[in-house]
């Protein structure tokens, strides 16, 4: 592990169409093999589908989905005297956003459907309505933290 100080994170520039940093982070996460234009097409198609299906502003639906998916607590393994405990820890906002995006895209990819854009749109709409596989993962993470509340005093 590095003994140097914390690195400064570069600010993520907003995307050109919706002017949202969160959407640009999503495009970067969807991207495979450096094909950013393909990833942007997928994300923007998904946003168009959300607008058609819900009639709401797609960015609002997306932000609501991200707010719902962001975990408040998670468990981290901590070794104490030969035993490993799952210690519940609060999640920093940046990590919470990263986890929410990771889960959203992972469960979009394994979801059934024709195109990645439609799978992503469906997962975003489900998350906005507090259903779907990504929400299930968030709830499971919260349950794990709740079950291991007894080890909270091992925080570091």
Swiss-Prot record:
Record bears the keyword Nucleotide-binding: no
> Keyword Ribosomal protein: yes or no?
yes
Which Pfam family, giving just one, matches this sequence?
Ribosomal_S7
Under the cellular component aspect of Gene Ontology, which terms does the record hold?
small ribosomal subunit
Keywords carried by this UniProt record: Ribonucleoprotein, Ribosomal protein, RNA-binding, rRNA-binding, tRNA-binding
Give any single GO term for biological process: translation
Task: List the GO molecular function terms.
Answer: rRNA binding; structural constituent of ribosome; tRNA binding
* Similarity field: Belongs to the universal ribosomal protein uS7 family.
How does this polypeptide assemble, per the annotation?
A: Part of the 30S ribosomal subunit. Contacts proteins S9 and S11.
Q: Report the function annotation for this chain.
A: One of the primary rRNA binding proteins, it binds directly to 16S rRNA where it nucleates assembly of the head domain of the 30S subunit. Is located at the subunit interface close to the decoding center, probably blocks exit of the E-site tRNA.
Among HAMAP family, the record links this protein to:
Ribosomal_uS7_B
Protein name according to UniProt: Small ribosomal subunit protein uS7
| Lineage, opening ranks | Bacteria, Bacillati, Cyanobacteriota, Cyanophyceae, Oscillatoriophycideae
């Amino acid at each position: 592990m590095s003994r140097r100080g914390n690195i400064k994170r570069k600010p993520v520039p907003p995307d050109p169409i919706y002017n949202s940093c969160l959407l640009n982070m999503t495009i970067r996460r969807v991207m495979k093999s450096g094909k950013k234009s393909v990833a942007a097409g997928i994300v923007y198609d998904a946003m168009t589908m959300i607008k058609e299906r819900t009639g709401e502003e797609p960015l609002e639906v997306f932000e609501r989905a991200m707010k719902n998916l962001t975990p408040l607590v998670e468990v981290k393994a901590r070794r104490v005297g030969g035993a490993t405990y799952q210690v519940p820890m609060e999640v920093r906002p940046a990590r919470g956003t990263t986890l929410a995006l990771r889960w959203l895209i992972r469960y979009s990819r394994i979801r059934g459907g024709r195109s990645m854009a439609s799978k992503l749109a469906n997962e975003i709409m489900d998350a906005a309505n507090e259903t779907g596989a990504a929400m299930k993962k968030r709830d499971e993470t919260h349950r794990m933290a709740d079950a291991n509340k007894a080890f909270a005093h091992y925080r570091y």
